[in-house]
Curated annotation (Swiss-Prot):
This is Enolase. One of its GO terms (biological process) is glycolytic process. PROSITE patterns: ENOLASE. (2R)-2-phosphoglycerate binds at Q168, K340, R369, S370, K391. The lineage of its organism: Bacteria, Bacillati, Cyanobacteriota, Cyanophyceae, Oscillatoriophycideae.
Length: 430
């Protein structure tokens, strides 16, 4: 981050707003003594890891079915604000540490990670506004010029859709594009062709939480076949120009040591072999949460079997947590981490986790949540950290497209300095 004379935090406001699923979430505004203001909104997940930081909900069934966040908002006004008012907005680490200390719990359950994160991000945005520079430049400095390869979730299943598909996300990745703008166009064209393919087969449905189609299909393999057909129909070469990726979210169908999919139970090794078969049959370059979040020994087997060929991303397994990431590094488990700000709860801890991953040659994928807002922080974060990949949903629903549009603007701002991650080997492991 850039150095600047101290600018104290003067005021903090917070409110309960709605996310993209119509559920309450937290918005915070941080105002500095100079008048600069930063605003941030926090997302929430549908498929959540057991070890994520605590999202504080009211539990009052008379409001939003118990999902209200008025306690989190009150915590910002009554507990967080008094702790950090007059602190230097440019000292992000100290601001975040003060909130962590004020909370005093391992998973932020006292104040709520949703309360802490909203203030953490709003503080960084206020500091960037004070300097009159974009957030990505404030966080990453002058070398922040790499636009990420998008993981576009165009077919939904699992916890993200009301259908009979086991795996949660089937994604396309434009690995052969020359720029982010071109990659986005390719993805949008494939998405449009997918709509046509589904319509022809009388499978066209509404979209899931993240904007992907959610048809009832006979198997997970049928979803991959549909993507291959859509890529071909759009005029692109699968594997060369556009690759496939999956979020299996296997914790959702793991029970009593077995994986239950396609209507029957399977041992961990049978499931690993099934994933291996899919990788051999389709141009899959990335699998997220290939095994359940506490199935560490079998994760090691999965990594040994597939890790040299594709990217194996830990989401529920690692929950943006440096302690769990260090365990994975020590065990040789996975080779990439999904980064979700609200899983850990502060900007500082998020950046520390990304740094730990980078130092140990693990890739980072910056990610949204299924319950999103119009906040575009993750787009700036992807560029600031040179992560090389971003996962922010499909090519429809404005809370998803907002992140893509922000990346288009960043690419335009950078001009000739902009580099598409796939061109310099920062895309998915292949």
């Amino acid at each position: 981050m850039l150095n600047k004379p101290e600018v104290p935090i003067e005021a903090i406001e917070a409110r309960e707003i709605l996310d993209s699923r119509g559920k309450p979430t937290v918005e915070a505004e941080v105002r500095l003594e100079t008048g600069a203001v930063g605003m941030a909104q926090v997302p929430s997940g549908a498929s959540t890891g057991t070890f994520e930081a605590h999202e504080l909900r009211d539990g009052d069934p008379s409001r939003y079915g118990g999902k209200g966040v008025t306690i989190a908002v009150r915590n910002i006004h009554e507990k967080i604000a008094p702790s950090i008012l007059d602190m230097d907005a440019f000292d992000q680490v100290s601001v975040d540490l003060k909130m962590i200390q004020r909370d005093g719990t391992p998973n932020k359950k006292e104040l709520g990670a949703n309360a802490i994160l909203a203030v953490s991000l709003a503080t960084a945005k206020a500091a960037a506004a004070e300097l009159d520079i974009p957030l990505y430049r404030y966080l990453g400095g002058p070398l922040s010029n790499v636009l990420p390869v998008p993981m576009m979730n165009v077919l939904n299943g699992g916890a993200h859709a009301d259908n009979n598909v086991d795996f949660q996300e089937f994604m396309i990745m434009p690995i052969g594009a020359d720029s982010f703008r071109e990659a986005l166009r390719w993805g949008a064209e494939v998405f449009a062709c997918l709509s046509s393919v589904l319509k022809e087969r009388k499978l066209l449905s509404g979209v899931g939480d993240e904007g992907g189609y959610a048809p009832n299909l006979g198997s997970n393999q049928e979803a991959l076949d549909l993507l291959m057909e859509a890529i071909d129909k759009a005029g692109y070469k699968a594997g060369e120009q556009i690759a496939l990726a999956m979020d299996v979210a296997s914790s959702e169908f793991y029970k009593d040591g077995q994986y239950i999919y396609d209507g029957s139970a399977h041992s961990p090794q049978e499931f690993i072999d099934y994933l291996d078969k899919l990788v051999s049959q389709y141009p899959i370059v990335s699998i997220e949460d290939g095994l359940a979040e506490e199935d560490w020994d079998n994760w090691k087997i999965l990594t040994d079997q597939l890790g040299s060929r594709i990217q194996l991303v830990g989401d529920d397994l690692l929950v943006t947590n440096p302690t769990r990431l260090q365990k994975a590094i020590d065990m040789g488990v996975a080779n990439s981490i999904l980064i979700k700000l609200n899983q850990i709860g502060t900007l500082t801890e998020t950046l520390e986790t990304i740094d730990l991953a980078t130092r140990n040659k693990y890739r980072s994928v910056i990610s949204h949540r299924s319950g999103e807002t119009e906040d575009t922080t993750i787009a700036d974060l992807a560029v600031a950290t040179r992560a090389g990949q971003i996962k922010t949903g499909s090519l429809c629903r404005s809370e998803r497209v907002a992140k893509y549009n922000r990346l288009l603007r960043i690419e335009d701002e950078l001009g000739d300095r902009a580099v598409y991650a796939a061109k310099i080997g920062l895309g998915p492991k292949a």
